[in-house]
Amino acid sequence: PQVSGFITQLCVEEGQAVRKGQLLFVIDQVPYQAALQTAQANVEAAEAALSTAKLTLDSKKELHAQNVVSAFDLQTAENSWLSAKAQLAQMKALELNARNNLSYTEVKSPSNGVVGTLPYRVGALVSASLPKPLTTVSDNSDMYVYFSLTENQLLGLTRQYGSKQKAL
């Protein structure tokens, strides 16, 4: 898994056929939901701070044009606005990271196939540094088999099935 936590749901059984994107496991989502809500609140706060900084900058521009405030005050207001803009970008990036982490709590099948062994059960603590994977999904849609036959065996199979293609 890409996140750490306790397995809260095991949605498949060993040997079960699964489709690409099917849910296999759910890792405890509570801390990741809280982190996302915090990140969303931080984005809203950063948007408000940016709006306030923009109002202050616009006001300082007008006052500077009338020689009421110094160029230093204007530059300070502009720097505050740029800082608030950067803070908003940072908070949006943190929100995206929190959203991704929450999505990683749902472990889905990467392909169609069959579920292998399930070494971890509900309640097990899992993390990205585990030595064993949560499970493996074996894609068995294309299988190639190599074997050897004597000419007599091939001839016998060809006679039995009517053609070499059907025999193999």
Language-model regions, residue ranges each:
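Amphipathic alpha-helical coiled-coil/rod segments that serve as protein-protein coupling scaffolds
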Residues: Q2-S129, D142-Y146, N152-Q160
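Short conserved beta-strand and strand-loop elements enriched in small hydrophobics
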Residues: K164-L168
